[in-house]
Regions:
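PLP-dependent enzyme catalytic core of the Aspartate aminotransferase-like
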Residues: 180-181, 196-238
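Active-site phosphate-binding strand-loop segment of PLP-dependent enzymes
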Residues: 1-54
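Short hydrophobic/aromatic beta-strand micro-patches
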Residues: 89, 164-166, 205-207
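Short, polar loop motifs at secondary-structure junctions
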Residues: 189-193
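Residue-level detector of anion-binding/catalytic polar loops
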Residues: 43, 154, 184
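Conserved glycine-rich beta-strand-loop-beta hairpin in the small C-terminal domain of fold type I
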Residues: 134-145, 153-166
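Conserved core segment of the aminotransferase class I/II
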Residues: 67-134
Length: 238
């Protein structure tokens, strides 16, 4: 509908979408490419921000004949926030338009920073560290999701730095309960313009937690949600 209405650009996160952690499957990417094939001049921007840390394959929605496109991969997720740089591949016209904006001044990208990033991503020891970090993030998310599921809150880990947790109560109220227990959680409606399902979601980041703290957080999420959620008896009472 948006394409038919004349939308000029689309931004897509193909992997580790924040906050949900979902990634495009090959089937879904193919479906979107087929739709976009009818609109080859709509600018398609893919923000593959998690790239080297992702545990999922990259599936693009940019078809081989699409005329306006850009694939962006930033490095700060795996090299740290000091490495404030992104690499872009695009069609020639989009590249030219971008180059005109990267003039000396606030949009200039330091050549020194570019060389430093190149040296880091070409270093085997650095790449091994990135791989260890990727495995760590996924393992911690998997463990937390399994713990929540064991406690009666079915959760899929997904990809990325956070876990998208469905709770059987308004997420804002659950987040307030968690704050009283010493945890800071982001309710799902902070990440959307209009999606009722997000009002029952929390975004939680757990990769820095010990096993003990991770289990305690999972227990606190479950307890907080159940303290607020209406009981089956109350919901079925006359």
């Amino acid at each position: 509908a948006a394409l038919d209405a004349g939308v000029r650009a689309i931004v897509c996160t193909p992997r580790a979408q924040n906050p949900t952690g979902v990634s495009l499957t090959a089937e879904r990417a193919a479906q979107l490419r087929a739709v976009l094939a009818q609109h080859p001049y709509v600018l398609v921007i893919e923000d593959d921000h998690f790239s080297m840390l992702s545990r999922e394959p990259y599936h693009s929605i940019i078809g081989p004949l699409h005329r306006r496109w850009a694939l962006i991969r930033s490095v700060s997720k795996f090299l740290g926030p000091d490495m404030c740089l992104a690499v872009t591949a695009s069609d020639p016209e989009t590249a030219e338009r971008l180059a005109r904006r990267l003039s000396p001044g606030s949009t200039w990208v330091s050549h020194l920073l570019q060389r430093l990033v190149l040296a880091l991503v070409s270093d085997d020891a650095v790449l091994a560290g990135v791989e260890r970090a990727a495995r760590h993030y996924r393992a911690r998310n998997d463990r937390f999701a399994a713990e929540l599921t064991r406690l009666g809150l079915p959760t899929a880990a997904g990809d990325g730095l956070s876990v998208w947790v469905r709770v059987p109560a308004p997420a804002r109220a659950v987040a307030e309960q968690l704050m009283r227990r010493g945890w800071l959680a982001r309710p799902g409606d902070e990440f959307v313009l209009a999606d009722p399902a997000a009002t029952h979601r929390l975004r939680l980041t757990v990769h820095d937690l010990s096993d003990t703290d991770l289990a305690r957080l999972a227990a606190d999420v479950a307890a907080s949600a159940r303290a607020i959620a209406p009981s089956p008896e109350a919901s079925t009472a006359p």
